[in-house]
Amino acid sequence: MTSPVLQTVALACERDLRLLFDNLELRLASGDMVQISGPNGSGKTSLLRLLAGLMQPTDGQVLLNGKPLGEQRSELARNLLWIGHAAGIKDLLTPEENLTWLCALHQPAERDAIWQALAAVGLRGFEDVPCHSLSAGQQRRVALARLYLDSPPLWILDEPFTALDKQGVAQLEEHLAGHCERGGLVVLTTHHTLSRMPAGYRDIDLGNWAV
């Protein structure tokens, strides 16, 4: 059996005095695409944030390469790319400036690489346009352009297809599947029905761990 990149051990999450899930056991390995599903309020986004080290569990733990997540923050920063439900960009900056700033936090990127990433998500010609002038879909593409840079192996994505048109959805599906087929790991939530899934695709319904 392939050693897991991410693993949860008896994981529990409580929000607003309500236990969302309990005793959650997951093993996520290289090559996997794992879709977290479940009804509204089941804790999908909370689970992603726990896996990304952005929240502390009520009980249990998350392991990265066999070691507790909290003990290896620098390792997590090198290995993780997190994109939340919001675009997470600064409106007053241009797409190029946003990506330069975001990449500088972890792995600085050259200008040519940033422009190529923006072109890959259909934003050629918008590199120097302030993001407040872009549509919601274009702003989402700025955030997703990080996936086309020299990115880490673990991607955790909350509703990545939000505000994308049909072409953008198809392109992103292909890119996510390709990342997994090259040995990466993708964990995501989405209300979109995926049409391009790698061999390592799994759907995990949090309703099975509801309390």
UniProtKB/Swiss-Prot annotation:
EC id: 7.6.2.5
Subcellular location, record wording: Cell inner membrane
InterPro entries: AAA+_ATPase, ABC_transporter-like_ATP-bd, ABC_transporter-like_CS, ABC_transptr_haem_export_CcmA, P-loop_NTPase
Entry-linked SMART domains: AAA
Class of enzymatic activity (EC top level): translocase
UniProt GO cellular component terms: plasma membrane
Binding site for ATP: 38-45
Keywords for the protein's UniProt record, in alphabetical order: ATP-binding, Cell inner membrane, Cell membrane, Cytochrome c-type biogenesis, Membrane, Nucleotide-binding, Translocase, Transport
Membrane topology: Peripheral membrane protein
Repeat recorded as keyword: no
Name of the protein in its database record: Cytochrome c biogenesis ATP-binding export protein CcmA
Origin species: Pseudomonas fluorescens (strain Pf0-1)
